[in-house]
Each structure stands twice: as C-alpha cells, then as structure tokens.
Amino acid sequence: MPIAKDYPELSKLIEDMYQTMYHSNGVGLAAPQVGLAIRLFVVDTEPFCENDDLSDAERDYLKSFKKAFINAKILKEEGEPWPFSEGCLSIPGISEDVLRKPTIVIEYQDEHFVTHTETFSGLVARVIQHEYDHIEGVLFTDHLSSFKKQLLKNKLNNISNGKVKVGYKMRFFETNKKRTR
C-alpha cells in the first residue's frame, strides 16, 4: 500500500527499522518484514565495505550509502545478470546465489516525500532489488530454480514452522496445510 504524507510517526518507524536492521546484522529491511503492508524499505550497505575485492572508491561509496525508499518503483533493470550469494533476515541460515541485473533505475520518495529518480549499480542495486522484492511480495528464494528450492525444502519448512534460532525476534504465522472449501 502506498504511504501518504500524513502516515503516523513515519520518521520513528524509519528509525526503528534501521535499528532493527542493525540489531539483526542486515543491510536492508522492508516494512513487510516487520508486519506492515506498506511500500517502505531501508538500506545501509556499510557492512559490504569490508569486502577486499572492492576498489577504494567502491568501499567508500558502500560505506556512505544509507537511504529510506518510500513508494518505490523500479522503472528499469539493465545489464547481464550476475550471481551473488544473498541471504535474508526473513529466511535465516540460508544463502544462495541469485541472478540479478547489475543496474537499476528507481523512482522513490525520501523521508520528506521529495520524489527522486536515480540509477544505481553493483551491490547497492542488488540490495535495493532484494528489498524492493519484499514490498512486491517476493523473497530471494522465489528467484531460485525448482531444483534448488527442492533441495532447500526441509530447511524452509523448518523456518516457516518456527524451528529456527536467531538473535532477533521473528513471528511465525500458522498455515493451513489443507485447502478448505
């Protein structure tokens, strides 16, 4: 659901989401991950700046990239898809290579509801795509092959049944295994 300018305590929500993300050692967090069906996610790529394979310029950029995205819409994804191991606070203990295009153009509003259209590339684009997927109802595992999903089935079932230990609070929703008419 789009967020209106008068959304109650939006600044506090954004700050709380950053704190939750930091406490959980994440680089991004979307509102659906904290139980809110709104188009909001936050990103802070500083943890990636420790990667020795990056140039000094890339490290500096990652270290300083922190943004909230409100009512975001990816307008374009470009380039040859490249694999990178992704994990997710919603699916703890699982990391898999996900193919994503390296460059995106995204339109979003900042915390002051100023609209921006920007182009991002590399790891920043990947994190944005990952978090954007959450507000679209998509998880990184949805990008995996059927074979890979089958290999992960038991782990995913354990997570969805609450059989997982993490250093942060998780909510588990009961699922009906049978259809009702």
Where are the regions that the model predicts?
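Positively charged
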Residues: 1-181
